[in-house]
């Protein structure tokens, strides 16, 4: 997917707020959905500043969709005022949970973190470090471990990771245009094979 580069560039030098945020969503069908709901239920155990969202503010419960017509509450990377409401808080940390856990499967749930210079506290692709700098990512396995991790966070943790946050931000911007990458891949394939 393509991302909103202009919006992402607004985060290049933004001041950060010591906070962790999280978006649960409404779906509860597969492993990642179930984990998000269990995490949401743990909110009362979080001792640092935080903001838990059950769903995006622009999600229409009557029509079960967003204004952009997407029937999923998460939609495309950083699109819609609901998502911007989440990222404009400038939180240092965000709990990012993929729908499922597979080696090379990662989505806007972590890419949005990189594009906004937010440290992802992440459950998802085990080999995300093959694509992004793992030192700018905090991993967790279940909701109980997540609560422990969050409650030990300090603002200094963010600043200690700053170099890796910047690397992941640059990589996300470089990889932002999905269709351009496909075009470059096809061009390279044609050239290599003399087609």
Which residue stretches match the model-derived regions?
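C-terminal anion-handling pockets and recognition modules
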Residues: 161-168
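Nucleotide-sugar donor-binding catalytic core of glycosyltransferases
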Residues: 1-139, 157, 169-193
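C-terminal "capping" alpha-helix adjacent to the active site of nucleotide-linked donor transferases
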Residues: 143-159
